[in-house]
A protein has these predicted regions:
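Conserved alpha/beta-domain cores
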Residues: 1-169
Length: 169
């Protein structure tokens, strides 16, 4: 059964494939399990006398509805854990902007998101269509030919990723 599940989840392009919030939407039990782990740990620590403020970050959001569906799971699980552990947790739910569509529609996502973070590695890969892992085979040549002035994985390319970040802000 495990081998069958592994084969079902095999991806042809893991960078753009079945991961992040997409995986959590299709298999909500994964998001539920992760949220439960966060809130149970937070409840245990807080019931031990230390104030905590967990921040749950939903990855790879490109559509507001993706985010909203995941937020519903997070809030439901938070309520269940707080009731079971008799604790009140102050928590935030936000997203990491990692795909161009997420940056371009950040105003919509912000209607629900309580915070944003930028995943500049993934955002660079998706904006430029370059794999960081493969870039060593061509980036030195690109620099030599002055196609790129700097390694876009070492510094933010202001003409692409930088502009996407400005739009999102």
């Amino acid at each position: 059964k495990i081998k069958q599940r592994v084969n079902e989840l095999h991806e042809f392009n893991p960078m753009l494939g079945f991961r992040g919030c997409r995986l959590g939407i299709v298999h909500g039990e994964i998001s539920e399990m992760q949220a439960r782990a966060v809130f149970e740990a937070a409840a245990e620590v807080q019931n031990g006398g230390t104030k905590v403020n967990p921040e749950v970050m939903i990855p790879l959001v490109g559509f507001k509805r993706e985010f909203d569906l995941q937020v519903e799971i997070v809030h439901r699980v938070a309520q269940e854990v707080q009731a079971a552990k008799k604790v009140k947790l102050n928590y935030l739910v936000g997203t990491m902007i990692e795909v161009p569509r997420g940056a371009l529609t950040a105003d919509e996502i912000a209607e629900t998101a309580e915070f944003f973070s930028f995943g500049t590695n993934d955002l660079t890969q998706t904006a430029l269509g370059m794999s960081r892992d493969d870039s060593g085979s061509f980036l030195p040549h690109y620099a030599e030919l002055e196609i790129v002035k700097r390694n876009p994985f070492a510094t933010i390319d202001q003409n692409s990723v930088g502009k996407l970040m400005q739009i999102a802000i």
